[in-house]
Every structure is written in C-alpha cells, then in structure tokens.
Amino acid sequence: ILSGSFGARLFSNIRSKQGLAYDVQGGVGFQWDYPGMAVLSMSTKTETTGAGIESLIREARDMVKNPPTDEEVEKAKSARLNSFVFSVDSPSKVLGKYLTYEYFGYSSDWLSKFKKGIEQVTTEQVREAARKHLRPEDFSILVVGPRKGTASALARYESVQELDITIPEPS
C-alpha cells in the first residue's frame, strides 16, 4: 500500500505529484533479525531533504488518518504474491531461501504458510497494523548526505546525532 507499485501511496505522492524522489519505498520490514520494523526511505536531492522527511512523515500519518481501502489492500496482496514468484524462479533462489529459513529456524513449509498468510490478510488487519505501528512520534530519522545542505532541515528535530561514515582512503 505504501510502496511496491507505481500506484502505491509513497510513489504516487512523493515521486509523481511532488517530484521529491526518484526512489521512494516503505513498509513493514522483513528483516530476519528485526522482524516487523517499519521502514520508510527515499533518495532525494540535498536541498529537498526537509520536504522529503516531512512528506514521509505525512504519508505515515495518512495511513492512519485515511486508512487503506479494500481495493488498496487487494492490490497490495496481489502485488506481493506476484512479486514473490520472481524470488523463487530458479533452483538456486529456492535453495537459497530454504537455507536462509533453515538458518533462522523457520519450518520447512514456511513458504506455503507465507503465501496463505498473505492471502488471508484483511483490510481491518492492515488498518489496525497502521494504527499500532506507524507512529511518526517514535520514528528514528537517518539522513545520509552533506551536513552543509541538510543541517537546517534537521534543526527542527529534538536530537540529531552526527556520525562520520567517511570511507578512509586505502593505505
């Protein structure tokens, strides 16, 4: 609903309508070590960093204020199931998935359970998940870019921690 297709909310509003990003994504993360972590991300020009952050936050709030429709949920389910096919379209990809599942302790029938689980998701479950988990007041914001162009955009946030991620020259 937030991303994954050209009609998704983030893509439609932030990329198409506002022109703030070429790449914008979001959803509930499916990381093995942090399952369920909500992530919104975009690539934008330095000078539109502030507007981009505000747009991402606004879209998160809008998922609660204007919850997904039945049509949005069905489209999202279909897109997820259809895209999943490409992650298992070769023997090496299937083997890789099974090895990953084994490593993280998932059952051998996890793939079929996953598919059935997606098919059974209801609009009300999506709405409840948005209400429960998309809380911009709890967001951590990560900006990668030059301080010169992003400092003023970040000044409005309570605590900004600067990290030097410079890659040293090889010696």
How would you describe each model-predicted region?
Residues 123-171:
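Proteolytic maturation boundary segments
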Residues 6, 48-49, 149-150:
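Short phosphate-engaging motifs
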Residues 1-9, 171:
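His/Glu-based metal-binding/catalytic segments typifying zinc-dependent metallopeptidases
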Residues 2, 11-121, 136-144:
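M16 family metallopeptidases and their MPP-like homologs
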